[in-house]
């Protein structure tokens, strides 16, 4: 039987129905990789962050997320190189959609019950997204701004509904605005923590601060 079109599952009509002990035999999600590019790049290397944001309350299939991931990654690698960006898919498919298979051959009425017992069996996974929810994010250098915007624009053709591209005011994937990040980084109030930044407050034990700054223990000695 052919795959049912995604337009049949576009709207959020029912409650969330995740995989569980009473919802078994769920097929695997088509998207298995959510981070691509230079994932281990420090927070200082990629200051620019661009988001693809949903404008609708809808469901997006795992096949569409995988198609968008491949589309964006291929364009970014082709134009900027594989080490020039960090792409992250922010929507995760957890909602299970069902299908009540119907036979269309001769004598089908003898083999099936029609709309009686029509609950259906698990058929795939979709992500339930809200208005304003981020679907994909790219952090890169300021020189690659046009490339990242074009990559996310191409991803819009893989999704139903409407989306918009937003250039974030934050520094990369961190929670700090760009001006705030530069100021606090120069004063030593935040330190890099992978692709994020950690704020150093003035509270806490002395041992905790020494663990963050091992070189300070030599000054105490």
UniProtKB/Swiss-Prot annotation:
Which organism's genome codes for this protein? Schizosaccharomyces pombe (strain 972 / ATCC 24843)
GO MF, any single term: structural constituent of ribosome
Its annotated compartments are:
Cytoplasm
From the record, what ranges are coiled-coil? none
Query: Single GO cellular component annotation?
Result: cytosol
PROSITE patterns given for it?
RIBOSOMAL_L10E (PS01257)
| Identification of the protein by name | Large ribosomal subunit protein uL16B
In the record, biological process GO terms are: cytoplasmic translation; ribosome biogenesis; translation
UniProt xrefs under NCBIfam families:
PRK04199.1-4 (NF003239), uL16_euk_arch (TIGR00279)
